[in-house]
Amino acid sequence: MNIFRDKKTHINIATIGHFNHGKTTLSAAIAMTLANKKYRLDKKSIKVTLEEKNQGIGIYTHHFQYETTLRHYSHTDCPGHTDYINNMIAGISQVDSTILVVSAVDGSMSQTKEHLLIAKLLGISSFIVFINKEDQLDDDKFVYLVQKEISQFLMSHGFQTNKIPIVSGSALLALETLIQQPNVLRGENYWVDKIYTLIELLDSYIPKPKRKKDKHFLMWIDSVKFLPNIGPIAMGRIEQGTIKVGEFIDIVGFRETRTAKIISLEFFNQSCMQVLAGDDIGVSIEGTKNHNDIKKGMIISTPGTIKSWLEFEAQVYILKREEGGRTSPFFKGYCPQFFFKTTCVTGRIEAIEYTTGSKTWMIMPGDKLKIQVNLVYPIGIKKRMRFLIREGGVLVGVGIISNLIK
């Protein structure tokens, strides 16, 4: 395995934005541009991503890697369709920064706003905007108008627009050029040069993340793949700590916690003996044979460091209508979906209390309250953990766990 981490900063990044605005095409164009410069490319992942693009809809999050002269990137291509928002939330919950893709023809759409809001609520503060499909504009002057519209949109969501880079281009024309002319150089094609500009911004604009390498090992499982004669491989990004082959971990969530041994580790299909915080990895665990043993949303962690919980208290903020939230109140007994990292679980709101301490039975959009939640099954969570609340296709609110009950 090429150990990049001794020489290059590792960054987890995602493409987000509205359905059919070109996220997958841009992801492929970035990777193929860097492959042309002889940097590493996970060609199998790009092939799968492009096949899904040809089917006309992105359903799953796809992961692949690439390198620049300065950094190594793990790239998550998030689905934009509203029916698969659960996969998008799971994917974006584990990244350091994002590329917001907006069509120059359509401008900001419903999923543009929701994806941006989700990223903001999950604590992602740095991102780059790529205005795609520039080639479809009749006049170059329209590019400026689209940039202005995007800036106003970002400003309305509380972002400092002077600190957010905006690049325009055509991911499709760049990708077609790279496929037809694999050896095209910078300066030889206008659209490929736009991708180079974006790549330079990835290196210069996105801050170096602070990794928690000295804490106990913790990873939320994002997906599970099955390999013949091996069994399930748990995939995910390491939240904190390090782990080695042969060490023991707890499998937490959905059922009784089990302790098992790490059989093997992989980093983008390459075997390795040790992995660190921030790495996107695959883990083979002793004793896991099927979907009941290991599944998306479970946690693997250093034994005894995290538990499963059914009930918790949290401080929450309920989004207003103009923020993309509900238009009407809800009441005690309300059962939305709660999103914790890669886990989505239904919960019942059992108690509601204002910040002043007085109890209430009704929650209005814009309220800040303390709630008590009873989940339908136990999951691995911890104090001060951030989560999203969603129901009926609407982002209801955001919260932070203040107390774990049982």
Curated annotation (Swiss-Prot):
Its main location: plastid. Its EC number is 3.6.5.3. GO terms for molecular function: GTP binding; GTPase activity; translation elongation factor activity. It is an enzyme of class 3 (hydrolase). It holds the Pfam family GTP_EFTU_D3. The keyword Nucleotidyltransferase does not apply. Keywords: Chloroplast, Elongation factor, GTP-binding, Hydrolase, Magnesium, Metal-binding, Nucleotide-binding, Plastid, Protein biosynthesis. Signal peptide: none annotated. It comes from the Eukaryota. Monomer. This is Elongation factor Tu, chloroplastic. The gene is tufA.
